């Protein structure tokens, strides 16, 4: 029985047995299906030809070859093996328990048959469910030839395979299921009813040549013996019938006179396969027969009907047609023979199917998990069988010449005997899982993915060398009977084996793919068995009486056991021990203290003797390569040292038992070392490819990210909101992962190399997956495997008291958050201040339990109350800085070059503050922990009480590290000297350690006071740093707003929970009268409309006069329309009851966001041709015409005329619009008021539009319908008299010499800036404003060139002012220019030119100017105060609330507003509000359109009034020339550094330093000069941290 696993069934013996036996007998087991064949079946498989008699065979299963087996047929191969190609269909006749199956294949071209044995793992079942389905009992009924049935149903119930009795052994063509069934069908049709004899009427006679196998004739433990009988058909031919013995509930009763037919299925349960598996199955079957798919109705769980597609040949269903290559068109012999098509593809059962219960359409990951679980179960069963084998049956590896072949070729070469190295069910399930599940690979320990220690082991060869080194060293220590060092190195051996097993576990997919799992399991069993024996026997030996007696009587010859507490150790050759420094650190030192002796004995155990290891031992260990011989094992053992035992009598019983144990340990070491080398030989020769990198065994940080535990890093490359991810605000589903940090789409994605590693370990390709889809797929796909991403458990855990984790709240970076922090910091100061703190007063009391309890309770209460401070630091919303970083890395196409330069400059200044923030956050974590520990220590009399609980080994001692004997440092000439210096330094440090020497006893009270002081200071400093972050945020937003870069503002604020402009949110109440008063014109008559609407409701109008879509409108609390459907809005626009002027203006301005132009005109025409309701009397009809139809017609005409007159632009033109000319002619014929004007406008705007010149935007006023044109002639109160203007002489003087800026009067300069700005402002049109809000979402509005010019002029003015100052080398000139521009800005404010005023103020507060301390020192205090007031006016806090209040007071005068406010209003109103209300798709959010229309109207309203200022060409020329070729802010900053270099103690100017800035400098300087050292080095400006790059 020793070679039962290396044999196959002997078919020749089976034939002889079959010919000798004529007695029918049947024996079966409960779990094995037996088949019966006649003698002619064996004859059909012989090589001798005979007449072509048909033989009917019923297979017990059908599989498709997954790999080539025994192909091509070799001369020396066994004739009993079946030769198949990948994709061929194999009909199974018998399944042996050894894993070998008896099967046959049929040649499509000639119908010849080849039969033989093949391993079960080379076959892939067509479907797992169809064999069970076809084994159900059939209902008897007769059917005609047109009966629709499944071919597999016929096969599985009544049809047999009719094969010729003289098959050829020649090579066949490809075989498919459809071809074989077609042959069977044709054979059945030609032979009639008597061709098949039912199982019930068939006697059993001659045995099957390959199925009837007895234990005497085969080495297989077969569970079934078969007997067959011969039956003659009507034509005298011999026929063989084979059938499986069914279970009790699966019988097939059919007589020979009945035809086979399909079951009557009214509701068939099916299983739909995914598209990937369908394509995999079909592409794996090569055939020249076209595959046919039939649509089948399907009943879903919701009783809905839909179509699925059914393949009759393969008996599979799918939800959509697969895309596969056309093998017929791609065939090479297409010209030789015509393509074949299935002859019976119409015979398909078209009854409705139903999905299997609890089996929806499964994805590949689900089936992969199922197959893996089945595989694991089968592997456990095989392990149980293997455990019954004797230990003497050692494993061996046949080192063939072809060991580099792949898996399938190894089977072909080695034969069936090699199949038993892996269990057959395990291999079968492995193949199925590889077909369905995606391939996975472990995350390797690569330096470009992880941060490794310098001595981390990253290669399998390194781990092998370390294991062998520890093994030989432990063996040597045992031979020298050094118990301490033997225990140490034996523990290290165990650790290395654990890590080896963990590495194999992580590479289980690669090992299974190479079919080496069972062999590796056996090796690990041997390793663990040897370790167990060594551990037990070594303890028995060292604890034996013989060993103790020997140690007592041993002389001092053995130097290894005499070295105690020495500073250096020597080996047998006198060399210093290789790992002496490591041993000194890892082994605890003995310590004695003078005062506290209560824990002296338990503090640290005394150091015992050290054994020496020759450093050359490691060099003698050769790395085992793939070609190294396994038997070349080198061990440090030569023989048992007889001198060790010669002094003891051999007759001593203790001597004999000890020697026996000694020898057993010695032998087990040799076995263990042999198993180690055997394991790595198998791994390197079969599993590893070119790279032998280890999987990542130890916890190490990913490169490019650091975030975990209580530390949150929002700049991490893969932070998630609820889960720590970064996406664009998408919901998390079961098939995709979102990765959004606080709904922030701007956070960086996972690094590519890290994403590739995670995706590969999860079985997905990172190239085809987006980074936001990796995490969930990874965790979903790997939930059933060993590797689970992010260390999540691979099984479901249930905790009875588990709390549902709530999403942490993000604290906005605002003043409110800062005030909360300051409040908590003040509480900390009151309680723990060193001078007046309540808690510190307790510490001065005498030591007692009451005093200690009060200290602990007060401290815990204080920490519990102030934990909010730590939570704010961890969850502070830094989205604006994250967006800033991402905009620098991936600039948006919407940003210009100037904005990109500003972002880089801003990041360089912000990064230092952010670095200080993270430093203070870490310091706060540390001080909280220290405060808790010092509070607890106040209750201890001995502060070293718990030191005995400290581990004897440092952190990471058990982790595998490279042995330093292999490093160049050890092998260098200075190693000995460095080793001695290191040992000396180590002992010096130990001698100075207070814990061991008690130089100074720790005072718990003083330590607690110091911790409280640091706690107070750090909490205060945290508030200062957050205040600086808020200031930096405001500076960013101020710049973006003042430079009118609304796109930059939107990008910076993306993802913030606290919206900067709250009033633009839909949640902002429409009832806010303060907001609406500024944007609603009273002339539009909203109040009159509400009153008239209420009056109409009270009148009880007849039903046919009411509005049809009134119920589809949504009103707010003030009666204004908030939303409605398109029909309701058009009806209200042309209402017959009253005119809503405000609504009409909004509708005509924003209609393009609701309807297309053609839809708008057609909706009005449809409204004009309104039909009367049914059932009206003659009088009611006349009333309807008079009071509803005619008013509506008039409203339609007026709306069209107004629209074409005031709100039309060429960009609204669409094909088909000129057709409304016919409508206008009809209106004229009906004599509707205003019809002729409408006809004229249509001819002008629509018909002759292309022939007319474009209208000058400067002369166009988009709100002329509401505003009287006479207002334009009104004189502005702000004007300049002729006396105030420069005289003609002055003008001549300016022309005679070159003008200098300081020569121009500031007021004159301000007036000319106002003239220039106002001229540009008048060119802005309504449609350009809409273009800024909508872009091209609804239509191409033609761009906004005039707005672009206006913004560019203002920004250039800003750069000009700052550049003019910074380019001056003389500090006095810079100060004069600064005061000059402050005066110009003030005059601009007086002229209501807020645009130029803001540009100048922004320039003076820019970083190149703001940092010029020497310049600002020379500026007068009056100018500084004036500039400060102007800056406060344009403060962006609360959405420019101060500026808005001032602008609201500017009425009926000329004005140039600051356009950045309007751009922000348009942008955030459009983005911050939905297009539809109530999450619907038809109720349009009209309030959003109203807000946009009000903003546009306010912009246009400032064009009504004009300045009465004279344009001075000379000064205009100077201004225009100065605004050309001005450098950007980055260049100006370089000039600023040249004129005033950066000083070490200067952080900014003093004229505008806030109180918080002063406090910051004060605290930073204090902490820099901390008495105990540099506690926090926050005073100096740090370079930009890599964290933000």
Swiss-Prot record:
Pfam families: RasGEF (PF00617), RasGEF_N (PF00618), SH3_1 (PF00018)
Main location: membrane
Domain of life from the UniProt record: Eukaryota
Extent of Basic residues compositional bias: 130-139, 1578-1589
Annotated InterPro entries: Ras-like_GEF, Ras-like_Gua-exchang_fac_N, Ras_G-nucl-exch_fac_CS, Ras_GEF_dom_sf, RASGEF_cat_dom, RASGEF_cat_dom_sf, SH3-like_dom_sf, SH3_domain
Disordered: region residues: 1-53, 121-243, 359-424, 553-574, 1249-1287, 1570-1589
Upper lineage: Eukaryota, Fungi, Dikarya, Ascomycota, Saccharomycotina
SUPFAM superfamilies given in the database record: Ras GEF, SH3-domain
Composition-biased stretches (Polar residues): 1-14, 173-205, 211-238, 415-424, 1260-1269
Modified residues (Phosphoserine): 151, 154, 423, 580, 596, 632, 649
Localization per record: Membrane
Name under which the protein is recorded: Cell division control protein 25
SH3 domain: residues covered: 58-128
Organism field: Saccharomyces cerevisiae (strain ATCC 204508 / S288c) (Baker's yeast)
Low complexity biased stretches: 20-53, 143-158
Gene Ontology biological process terms from the UniProt entry: cell division; Ras protein signal transduction; regulation of cell cycle; traversing start control point of mitotic cell cycle
Record field: transmembrane: 1452-1473
Miscellaneous comment as given in the Swiss-Prot or TrEMBL entry: Present with 319 molecules/cell in log phase SD medium.
GO cellular component, one term: nucleus
Domain Ras-GEF: 1305-1542
Listed Basic and acidic residues bias regions: 359-375, 1249-1259
Record-listed Phosphothreonine modification sites: 635
GO MF annotations in UniProt: guanyl-nucleotide exchange factor activity
């Amino acid at each position: 029985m020793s070679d039962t696993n290396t044999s196959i069934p002997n078919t020749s013996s089976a034939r002889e047995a079959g010919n000798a036996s004529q007695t029918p007998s049947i024996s079966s087991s409960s779990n094995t299906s037996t088949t019966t064949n006649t003698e002619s079946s064996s004859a059909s498989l012989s090589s001798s030809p005979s007449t072509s008699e048909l033989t009917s065979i019923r297979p017990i299963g059908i599989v498709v070859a997954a790999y080539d087996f025994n192909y091509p047929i070799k001369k020396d191969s066994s004739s009993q093996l079946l030769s198949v190609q990948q994709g061929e269909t194999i009909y199974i006749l018998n399944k042996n328990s050894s894993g070998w199956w008896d099967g046959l294949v049929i040649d499509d071209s000639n119908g010849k048959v080849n039969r033989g044995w093949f391993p079960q793992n080379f076959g892939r079942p067509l479907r797992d469910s169809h064999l069970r389905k076809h084994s159900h009992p059939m209902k008897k009924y007769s059917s005609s030839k047109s009966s629709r049935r499944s071919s597999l149903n016929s096969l599985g119930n009544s049809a047999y395979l009719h094969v010729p009795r003289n098959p050829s052994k020649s090579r066949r063509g490809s075989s498919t299921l459809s071809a074989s069934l077609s042959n069977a069908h044709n054979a059945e049709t030609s032979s009639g009813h008597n061709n098949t004899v039912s199982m019930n009427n068939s006697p059993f006679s001659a045995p099957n040549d390959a199925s009837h196998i007895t234990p005497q004739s085969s080495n297989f433990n077969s569970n079934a013996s078969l007997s067959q009988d011969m039956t003659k058909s009507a034509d005298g031919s011999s026929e063989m019938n084979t059938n499986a013995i069914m279970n009790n509930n699966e019988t097939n009763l059919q007589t020979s006179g009945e035809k086979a037919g399909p079951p009557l299925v009214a509701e068939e349960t099916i299983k739909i396969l995914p598209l990937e598996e369908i394509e995999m199955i079909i592409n794996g079957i090569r055939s020249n027969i076209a595959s046919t798919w039939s649509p089948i109705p399907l009943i879903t769980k919701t009783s809905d009907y839909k179509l699925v597609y059914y393949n009759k040949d393969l008996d599979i269903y799918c939800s959509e047609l697969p895309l596969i290559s056309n093998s017929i068109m791609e065939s090479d012999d297409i010209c030789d023979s015509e393509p074949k098509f299935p002859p019976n593809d119409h015979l398909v059962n078209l009854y409705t199917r139903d999905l299997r219960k609890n089996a929806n359409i499964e994805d590949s990951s689900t089936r992969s998990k199922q197959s893996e679980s089945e595989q694991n179960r089968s592997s456990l069963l095989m392990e149980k069988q293997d455990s019954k084998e004797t230990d003497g049956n050692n494993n061996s590896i046949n080192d063939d010449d072809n060991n580099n072949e792949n898996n399938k070729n190894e089977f072909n070469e080695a034969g069936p005997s090699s199949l038993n190295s892996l269990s057959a069910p395990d291999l079968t399930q492995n193949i199925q899982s590889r077909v369905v599940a995606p391939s996975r690979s472990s995350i390797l320990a690569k330096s470009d993915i992880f941060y490794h220690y310098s001595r981390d082991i990253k290669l399998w060869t390194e781990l092998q060398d370390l294991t062998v080194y520890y093994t030989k060293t432990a063996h040597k220590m045992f031979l020298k009977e050094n118990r301490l060092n033997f225990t140490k190195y034996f523990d290290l051996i165990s650790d290395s084996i654990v890590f080896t097993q963990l590495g194999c576990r992580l590479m289980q997919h690669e090992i299974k793919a190479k079919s080496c799992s069972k062999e590796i399991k056996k090796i690990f069993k041997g390793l663990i068995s040897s370790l167990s024996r060594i551990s037990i026997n070594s303890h028995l030996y060292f604890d034996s009486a013989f060993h103790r007696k020997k140690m007592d009587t041993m002389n001092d010859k053995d130097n290894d056991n005499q070295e105690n507490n020495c500073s250096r150790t020597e080996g047998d050759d006198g060399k210093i021990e290789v790992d002496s420094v490591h041993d000194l650190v890892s082994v605890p030192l003995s310590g004695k203290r003078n005062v506290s002796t209560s824990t002296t004995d338990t503090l640290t155990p005394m150091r015992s003797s050290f054994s020496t290891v020759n450093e050359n031992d490691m060099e003698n260990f050769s790395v085992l390569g793939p070609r190294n011989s396994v038997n070349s094992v080198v061990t440090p053992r030569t023989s048992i040292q007889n001198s060790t035992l010669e002094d003891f009598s051999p007759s001593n019983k203790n001597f004999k038992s000890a020697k026996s144990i000694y020898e057993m340990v010695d032998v087990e070491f040799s076995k263990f070392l042999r198993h180690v080398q055997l394991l790595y030989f198998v791994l390197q020769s079969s599993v590893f490819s070119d790279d032998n990198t280890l999987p990542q065994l130890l916890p190490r940080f990913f490169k490019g990210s650091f975030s975990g535990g209580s530390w949150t890093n929002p700049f991490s490359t893969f932070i998630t909101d609820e889960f720590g991810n970064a996406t664009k605000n998408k919901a998390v589903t079961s098939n995709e992962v979102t990765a959004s940090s606080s709904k922030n789409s701007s956070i960086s994605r996972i690094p590519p190399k890290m994403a590739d590693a995670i995706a590969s370990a999860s079985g997905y390709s990172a190239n085809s997956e987006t980074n936001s889809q990796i995490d969930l797929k990874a965790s979903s796909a790997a939930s059933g495997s060993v590797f689970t991403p992010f260390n999540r458990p691979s099984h479901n855990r249930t905790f009875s008291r588990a709390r549902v984790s709530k999403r942490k709240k993000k604290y906005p970076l605002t003043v409110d958050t800062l005030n909360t922090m300051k409040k908590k910091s003040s509480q900390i100061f009151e309680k723990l201040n060193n001078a007046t703190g309540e808690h510190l007063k307790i510490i001065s009391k005498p030591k007692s339990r009451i005093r200690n309890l009060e200290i602990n309770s007060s401290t815990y209460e204080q920490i519990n109350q102030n934990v909010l401070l730590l939570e704010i630091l961890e969850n502070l919303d830094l989205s604006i800085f994250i967006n800033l970083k991402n905009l620098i890395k991936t600039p948006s196409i919407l940003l210009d070059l100037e904005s990109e330069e500003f972002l880089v400059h801003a990041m360089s200044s912000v990064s230092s503050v952010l670095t200080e923030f993270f430093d203070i956050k870490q310091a706060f974590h540390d001080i909280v922990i220290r405060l808790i520990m010092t509070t607890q220590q106040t209750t201890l009399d001995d502060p070293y009480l718990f030191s005995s609980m400290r581990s004897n080994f440092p952190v990471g001692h058990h982790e595998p590290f490279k042995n330093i004997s292999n490093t160049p440092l050890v092998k260098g000439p200075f190693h000995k000297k460095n080793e001695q210096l290191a040992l000396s330094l180590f002992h010096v440090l130990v001698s100075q350690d207070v814990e061991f020497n008690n130089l100074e006893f720790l005072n718990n009270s003083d330590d607690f006071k110091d911790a409280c002081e640091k706690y107070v200071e750090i909490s205060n400093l945290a508030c200062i740093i957050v205040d600086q972050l808020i200031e930096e945020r405001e500076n960013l937003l101020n710049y973006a707003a003042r430079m009118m870069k609304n796109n930059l503002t939107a990008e910076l604020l993306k993802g913030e929970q606290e919206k900067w402009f709250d009033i633009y949110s839909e949640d902002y109440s429409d009832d806010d009268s303060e907001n609406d008063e500024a944007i609603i014109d009273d002339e539009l008559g909203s109040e009159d409309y509400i009153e008239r609407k209420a009056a109409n409701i009270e009148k009880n109008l007849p039903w046919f006069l009411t509005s049809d879509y009134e119920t589809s409108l949504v009103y707010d609390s003030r009666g204004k329309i908030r939303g409605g459907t398109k029909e309701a809005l058009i009806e209200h626009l042309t209402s017959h009851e009253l005119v809503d002027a405000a609504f009409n203006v909004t509708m005509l301005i924003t209609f393009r966001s609701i309807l297309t132009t053609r839809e708008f005109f057609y909706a009005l025409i449809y409204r004009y041709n309104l039909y009367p309701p049914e059932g009206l009397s003659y009088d009611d009809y006349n009333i309807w015409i008079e009071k509803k139809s005619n008013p509506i017609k008039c409203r339609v005409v007026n709306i069209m005329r107004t629209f074409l007159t005031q709100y039309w632009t060429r960009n609204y033109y669409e094909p088909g619009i000129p057709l409304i000319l016919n409508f206008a002619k009809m209106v004229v014929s009906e004599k509707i008021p205003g019809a002729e004007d409408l006809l004229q406008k249509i001819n002008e705007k629509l018909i002759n539009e292309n022939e007319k010149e474009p209208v000058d935007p400067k002369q166009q006023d988009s709100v002329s319908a509401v505003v009287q044109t006479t207002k334009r002639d009104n004189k502005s109160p702000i004007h300049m008299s002729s006396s105030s203007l420069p005289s003609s002489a002055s003008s001549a003087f300016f022309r005679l010499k070159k003008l200098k800026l300081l020569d121009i009067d500031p007021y004159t300069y301000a007036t000319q800036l106002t003239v220039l700005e106002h001229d540009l402002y008048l060119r802005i049109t309504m449609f350009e404003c809409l273009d800024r809000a909508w872009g091209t979402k609804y239509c191409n509005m033609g761009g906004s060139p005039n707005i672009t010019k206006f913004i560019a002029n203002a920004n250039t003015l800003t750069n000009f002012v700052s550049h003019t100052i910074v380019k001056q080398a003389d500090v006095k000139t810079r100060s004069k220019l600064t005061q000059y521009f402050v005066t110009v800005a003030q005059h601009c404010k007086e002229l209501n030119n807020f645009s130029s005023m803001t540009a100048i103020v922004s320039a003076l507060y820019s970083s190149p100017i703001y940092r010029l301390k020497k310049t600002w020192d020379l500026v007068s205090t009056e100018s500084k105060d004036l500039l400060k007031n102007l800056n406060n006016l344009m403060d962006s806090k609360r959405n420019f609330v101060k500026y808005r209040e001032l602008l609201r007071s500017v009425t009926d005068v000329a004005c140039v507003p600051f356009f950045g406010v309007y751009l922000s209003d348009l942008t955030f109103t459009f983005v911050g509000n939905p297009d539809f209300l109530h999450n619907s798709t038809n109720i349009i959010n009209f309030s959003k359109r109203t807000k946009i229309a009000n903003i546009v109207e306010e912009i246009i309203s400032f064009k009504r009034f004009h300045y009465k200022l004279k344009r001075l060409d000379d000064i205009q020329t100077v201004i225009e020339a100065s605004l050309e070729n001005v450098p950007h802010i980055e260049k100006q900053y370089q000039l600023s550094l040249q004129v005033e270099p950066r000083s070490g103690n200067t952080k900014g100017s003093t004229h505008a330093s806030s109180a918080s800035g002063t406090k910051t400098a004060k605290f930073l300087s204090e902490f820099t000069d901390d008495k105990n050292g540099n506690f926090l080095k926050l005073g100096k400006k740090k370079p930009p941290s890599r964290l933000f790059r």
